[in-house]
């Protein structure tokens, strides 16, 4: 595993450049260069012994273990399990950023997994509501991985490939004695290896990196794979909305893990300048959020602005989904504090009280957010996440990273199963209930809900087969998939590609055959994970007990080649070609497919399945329903309040505002056939007896009327206000600079943020001096409101967290974007209500 001499100049040059960049301490240049060169040669001279794998890191020596894989084409992998990357976040360090681990003098055995971060288990089992099908179908097995819990849980696992596998030797032999073989070596044999850091999902509430064995991916792709534990739930994301507990500790754990990797992976033969982060579900949204945080900047090995990692793969999750960010963390902090007897007004005392509680008492509390949202997760704290993710993307904060992202065909499978009885299809009444419940939980304006419901029903009704329950089930599945995954992913890809940054988009259309999922299911959330990890190559496992076929093995090899190619070069097509003749004697279809870069104009994506092809504009009609039409419907009720992140409030204290009574009728702002004669208004659940031609006529008439009456009336005003909104973005969300980096003292940072807040207040007030407004930020895109629950209260202010007082006011029952009571459900009772209608979304 020692580096060849031809690679030494490359590392020496990197060390010299890093030294020059970091010479700010005033040390003599000669001494600085000498120290960097000694460090570099120490890294290069280390040899990883397969028999007794011992590595000396910056914190001490660790011993790994060699593991043979159950496939003759895969070489052995050396595993280093339970490696500490941070100090235990216990006691007064709870709800604090992580600190580097303490060094050790003896050899540390890294041969078994470390404890997982605390999470809620009931009678030894994780919650039943788990989204990935392989979680739900193997809940007992998954639960066995999270029994050993401890707050001392900040560890990672490293999987290092060896050079003696048949696949490696085959590629090396094919190179022969060609000149410049080092430059042409498509497997990176002998050189520093790319590094892939996997972030697990679980809705920021459950999971562990220990679940994901990176051995096959490391061996087949000749990359180093790392899996990480990070703090979850209340311990990882509690925020009081001020300096008492800023939140985002789980994200800071991941940043510390990347910092540790950048500084130590060279000892394992890894390349600190080729680090890729990837994850699925909530792990994918973490990946996206890390690309937007200035904490990810700064790699001591290089003067590059790309920071602690250079590439990112977001599988079935981005920062724009409704479940990606918690918009009212202080409310949930107060609820938790009340449950455990820490409900004091001063937030500093509140946090001190929570720090003294046993961790199990905290994680066992049931704090339920609105459906499709999260209670404890990443927050806009003005620091780790400086602003709303969409605004940061519009400003190009992630343009320095190569990004691959995508979705699965039927992500919303568990949403459908958890809402309605779908074994025999979906009845008309169940379909109506699901859509109404969906709208009530995601959109907070009562006057326009009737129009929105009918619009969604119209768009997701297959009019050629509208009476078929199985067809309704299929369209309902598409509704959840499109809103929660596809539209956010496409919006993210559009924003990233707008800056010319390399962007690749995929749609995954395959899943393994098993009796544990219904026959009608498509590729559901998490179904791509076993193929990324190469599980089909070693056969069924406890976590993935599928009947893998040769097609599954072939597809897994294809996916691993794409993923590891991207980690090596930023291009999934290079350098290793798609060659799976070791599985099939005939070429696979992927050999003839070139995965084209994504652009907003063409929106090209790769269809990953047994019949691969490059297509364009993935589900364009439905995507634009959510990204274009629905936001316009949301704002047609009151065009004078165009910016949906502001709302007028009386000059008196908002806590004195009376709530709307449940008995108050909710009427639509738009005339419909239903409102003409209330006596003939049908029940929302008598769909089977309803004349769909009448509904179609009504919907078309309403839509045509809205378009005709509003396009001419509001076109000019829309353009003017849209232009002003973008101008406000530029003024109110200033670009970050390195001046507010970690080198600032806390007092300087607080003062800086306070000054920004004061300046921005005056600047924003000049926009509407006659209005009293309550803002979550200077106006972001109106699609921000699409990601909030109806009872969201804007308690966090981007870039101004230090300005929030050290007390949390009483929980406000009103949503500031509308006038109905938070949490009110405007749908009629469902004949078969789901027992957990507000269960936390798991992604």
UniProtKB/Swiss-Prot annotation:
Stated induction or repression of this protein's expression: Expressed in a circadian manner in the brain with highest expression seen at Zeitgeber time (ZT) 6 hours.
GO molecular function terms listed in the Swiss-Prot or TrEMBL record: identical protein binding; neurexin family protein binding
Major location category of this protein: membrane
Secreted is among the record's keywords: yes
Effect in UniProt of substituting residue 317 to E: Decreased protein abundance. Not delivered to the plasma membrane
Cystine pairings recorded for this chain: 117-153, 342-353, 512-546
Ranges annotated as spanning the membrane: 698-718
UniProt topology in membrane: Single-pass type I membrane protein
Signal peptide: 1-45
Domain of life: Eukaryota
Gene Ontology, cellular component aspect: cell surface; dendrite; dendritic spine; excitatory synapse; external side of plasma membrane; filopodium tip; glutamatergic synapse; Golgi apparatus
Annotated compartments: Cell membrane; Postsynaptic density; Synaptic cleft; Synaptic cell membrane
Region Disordered: start-end pairs: 167-190, 647-688, 822-843
Expression by tissue: Brain and arteries (at protein level). Expressed in olfactory bulb. Detected in brain.
A biological process from GO: synapse assembly
Residue stretches of biased makeup (Polar residues): 661-670
Keyword field contains Amino-acid biosynthesis: no
Glycosylation sites: 109, 303, 343, 547, 683, 686
Biased segments, Acidic residues type: 175-186
InterPro entries from the UniProt entry: AB_hydrolase_fold, CarbesteraseB, Carboxylesterase_B_CS, Neuroligin/BSAL, Nlgn
Cytoplasmic side: 719-843
Family note: Belongs to the type-B carboxylesterase/lipase family.
Subunit structure: Interacts with neurexins NRXN1, NRXN2 and NRXN3. Interaction with neurexins is mediated by heparan sulfate glycan modification on neurexin. Interacts (via its C-terminus) with DLG4/PSD-95 (via PDZ domain 3). Interacts with AIP1, GOPC and PDZRN3. Interacts with NLGN3.
Entry protein name: Neuroligin-1
